[in-house]
Amino acid sequence: IKYSVEWWNTLHQGATFTLTEKPAMPVEMWAPLLLMVLGFYCFFGAVLLLRMRLEVLKREARTSWVKAEVQTSLGARG
């Protein structure tokens, strides 16, 4: 499969981003694309950490430190 992509490269687009060469697309296109990719990674990381925190709190729901955390969280809201 690797050689078929190299031999008949009209069927497949080459790499748009490489670390060693200038991007194949104009700056007006790749700068927002890169910004959105970085933004997505940050969003994904934040959601992943929140879900991990929730899972730990669910598993440890009967412990005293979770009850204290919930009380602190509810007290901070209002």
Swiss-Prot record:
Asked if the keyword Aminoacyl-tRNA synthetase belongs to this entry, the reply reads: no
Membrane-spanning parts: 30-50
Keyword list (alphabetical) reads: Cell inner membrane, Cell membrane, Cytochrome c-type biogenesis, Membrane, Transmembrane, Transmembrane helix, Transport
Q: State the membrane topology.
A: Multi-pass membrane protein
Q: Which SUPFAM superfamilies match?
A: TNF-like
GO cellular component term, pick one:
plasma membrane
User: What InterPro entries is this protein classified in?
Assistant: Tumour_necrosis_fac-like_dom
Q: Which cysteine-cysteine pairs are annotated as disulfide bonds in the entry?
A: none
Specify the superkingdom.
Answer: Bacteria
Q: Does the keyword 4Fe-4S apply?
A: no
Location (main, coarse): membrane
**Where found?**
Cell inner membrane
GO BP terms in the entry: cytochrome complex assembly
Q: What does this protein's UniProt record list under function?
A: Required for the export of heme to the periplasm for the biogenesis of c-type cytochromes.
Similarity comment: family membership:
Belongs to the CcmC/CycZ/HelC family.
Name of protein: Heme exporter protein C
Organism this protein belongs to = Pseudomonas fluorescens
The encoding gene is: helC
